Design a protein with these regions (language model features):
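Hydrophobic ligand-binding cavity/cleft-lining segments
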Residues: 2-97
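Beta-strand/loop substructures that line and gate deep hydrophobic ligand-binding cavities in soluble
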Residues: 131-150
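Heme-based O2/NO sensor domains and their adjacent alpha-helical segments
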Residues: 103-119
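A generic structural signal for well-ordered coil/turn residues at beta-strand boundaries
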Residues: 29-31, 111, 136
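Core RNA-modification/binding signature centered on pseudouridine synthases
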Residues: 116, 128-132
């Protein structure tokens, strides 16, 4: 089994019965990646927990430097003002959720990451970010890899 990340054709995402297709159907799909992970059919919550716990402050120096530059440019250009984000410039995707997905996810992110959880199921999760430049979604899905893993 190949343990490296691989960019996929967007049709790989479109073929899945993801809930995100209905919730964010007016968003443009930028790219799709297969990321190596260990686990079985019930291990998606572990991946979500890992994503939730990411902190740029724990990253290598080069990654931390990129975050510092990004936040400084954002402050200089006014990209991240509160009035340009979620529930200000744009409504959260949570307002589009069907009742069965609308329950509080219980997830939070460190202040250093500007993502907000939209929904989590047993095999997919969506997180959103909004500022002056973008309203974007990070969607994670748990798909069998064909080699007994996910």
């Amino acid at each position: 089994m190949d343990h490296s990340a691989a960019r996929l054709d967007p049709s790989a995402h479109a073929r899945q019965p993801w809930r995100i297709h209905d919730i964010a159907n007016d968003f443009r799909l930028e790219d799709v990646w297969a990321l190596p992970s260990r686990g079985g059919p019930d291990d998606f919550p572990r991946l979500v927990s890992l994503i939730q716990s990411l902190d740029p402050g724990d990253s290598p120096l080069a990654v931390r430097a990129l975050f510092v530059v990004r936040w400084q440019l954002g402050a200089l250009l006014g990209l991240d003002r509160g009035e340009t984000g979620l529930d200000a410039r744009v409504d959260s995707l949570r307002t589009r959720l069907p009742e069965e997905l609308a329950a509080d996810t219980g997830l939070t992110f460190p202040e250093s990451l500007p993502f907000r959880p939209v929904y989590v199921t047993d095999r997919e999760a969506a997180f959103e970010i909004a500022n002056t430049a973008v309203h974007a979604v990070m969607h994670l899905g748990w798909v069998p890899d064909g080699d007994g893993g996910y």
